[in-house]
Amino acid sequence: MGRAKKVVLAYSGGVDTSVCIPYLMHEWGVEEVITLAADLGQGDELGPIQEKALRCGAVESLVIDGKEEFVKEYAFRSIQANALYENRYPLSTALARPLIAKMLVEAAEKYGADAVAHGCTGKGNDQVRFDISIMALNPNLKVLAPAREWKMSREETIAYGERYGVESPVKKSSPYSIDRNILGRSIEAGPLEDPMTEPTEEIYLMTKAIADTPDEPEYVDIGFEKGIPVSLNGVMLDPVTLVERLNEIAGNHGVGRLDMVENRVVGIKSREIYEAPALLVLIDAHRDLESLTQTADVTHYKNTVEEIYSQLIYRGLWYSPLKEALDAFIVKTQERVTGMVRVKFFKGNANVAGRKSDYSIYDAELATYGMEDQFDHKAAEGFIYIWGLPTKVWAQKMRG
């Protein structure tokens, strides 16, 4: 008896997920494999994917357009939370996994499958994100991960696939592992496994080298409503178009590159290169608008929440009770985060050049050092005495 009767497989069109199709059928006794490819803005990579899956033995090949849901329900929530894993990575790849898991579960329920599968290995983060998300959405579904068990080398995997008509798209001149969606690209492996090896310019597609960027700055006004980006330069845009246009603008000025060593869920460190132009700019602009519209205590407490929120996303806990509870807090904090942030793009930098909001709690008459100053300077002395009293008492005791 096979491990499952009917399986919905998360499909990318690459070697591993293509080999998963015959492997599931011939090694694990699966009767039917349905592939599902999520269109999250990979570009033309999804063109021939349906035909390839069918040639590899799938009984049906699904391609689902999830770009709008991805940006609106996943990326924009992350922006409201200023989510940066380890204060740097904007989770452009990690955010896609809970949505793909949701699509897998929905397809399994629609087609009567008793299992879902993915092509993740046992070394990466994505296996954790897929497995836990699927467990949360439908704990009755089996989760199969052939690449986690088959113990084949890259060469052996390709050879196995060729026995069953799987074509290998791998170019020997490209040793990198690359993942792409509308939010950005992640590049790893090959020469990048040496933390001292500088990335070559050829690995970047979304961002220009500084030498190739314009010699004049460009200003962009980003409009927000309740923490959600809604416009560029006063023009209201749908979520997908807004991200696409900002990717182009920021990338044209060399903005959006990251080179970091991060702590994976499975306990190892990994060197990663990321391109995420729009996402990084939006998080920075959003945080700046919050500084204008939120009280100090909300800002300081939210900083703690943001760190935990980022960890939950990275570690595959998008559908967890804690994540749901933090969502409620974050939404509440965004009620007055409405306004505009002006960003200046120039030579690899995206700096906030101005901000405004009808909900601003910045008071120029209190902040100024000019003649218009309304701040009560005399009140400062009493405040300092009370505020510093514990320190003074402690110092007196320590001195005996």
UniProtKB/Swiss-Prot annotation:
Family: Belongs to the argininosuccinate synthase family. Type 1 subfamily.
Regulation: Activity decreases to 53.9% and 18.4% in the presence of 1 mM and 5 mM arginine, respectively. Activity also decreases to 80.1%, 78.1% and 92.1% in the presence of 5 mM ornithine, lysine and succinate, respectively. Activity does not decrease in the presence of glutamate, glutamine or asparagine.
Superkingdom in the source lineage: Bacteria
EC number: 6.3.4.5
GO molecular function: argininosuccinate synthase activity; ATP binding
A Gene Ontology biological process term: argininosuccinate metabolic process
Role according to the record: Catalyzes the condensation of citrulline and aspartate into argininosuccinate, the immediate precursor of arginine. SyArgG is the rate-limiting step in arginine biosynthesis in Synechocystis PCC 6803.
A Pfam family hit: Arginosuc_synth
SUPFAM superfamilies reported for this sequence: Adenine nucleotide alpha hydrolases-like, Argininosuccinate synthetase, C-terminal domain
Subunit structure: Homotetramer.
Binding site for L-aspartate: T121, N125, D126
Localization in the cell: Cytoplasm
Record keywords, A-Z: Amino-acid biosynthesis, Arginine biosynthesis, ATP-binding, Cytoplasm, Ligase, Nucleotide-binding
Protein name (record): Argininosuccinate synthase
